[in-house]
Regions:
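A broad structural signal for short, well-ordered beta-strand segments within beta-sheet-rich domains
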Residues: 6, 23, 63, 123-127
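Amphipathic hydrophobic-ligand
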Residues: 2-11
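Predominantly extracellular/secreted and cell-surface proteins with exposed
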Residues: 10-97
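Extracellularly exposed regions in secreted/surface proteins, prominently low-complexity, repeat-rich
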Residues: 92, 96-139
């Protein structure tokens, strides 16, 4: 099956990044338009994002869970472990994960998301993109 390509926007409430690693939680939503794979036409997909982190202004260290809800009511639960150095001036970050449950379970995920800023709590908004590569069928 061909990959599913999604583009859209992300709105995440963040505790903000500090100079030293700080435990925190975050949550928000993403809105995508997805196509490819087994989708017959471009499809609007909503997701809920939540996670925990121990990040700083120089390093993202987090576990993100994103649950996509497809128009037919099925869901895909995605887990993305993040361990990434923050480059000065970066506006987004590319991460990889796995569909752990639901539609496309076992598939790989590559996601590009807005980079949180160093500073006080804030809403992190910006473009988001995701590619889901479905797992090969078991023979």
């Amino acid at each position: 099956m061909l990959p599913v390509e999604c583009t859209g926007t992300s709105k995440i409430e963040s505790d903000g990044l500090k100079e030293q690693p700080t435990p925190q939680t975050y949550k928000g939503t993403r809105s995508y338009v997805c196509s490819g794979g087994d989708l017959l036409a471009p499809t609007a997909v909503e997701s809920v994002v939540e996670g925990t982190a121990n990040s700083s202004c120089t390093k993202l260290s987090a576990t993100t869970r994103e649950t996509l809800t497809w128009p037919d009511g099925t869901t895909s639960e995605i887990e993305i472990p993040i361990e990434v150095a923050i480059e000065p001036g970066a506006v987004d970050v590319r991460v990889t994960g796995t569909v752990v449950k639901g539609k496309y379970a076992g598939g790989g995920v590559t996601s590009t998301i807005p980079m949180p800023r160093c500073g006080p709590p804030a809403r992190v908004e910006g473009p988001a993109a995701m590619t889901i590569t479905p797992a090969a069928p078991v023979a």
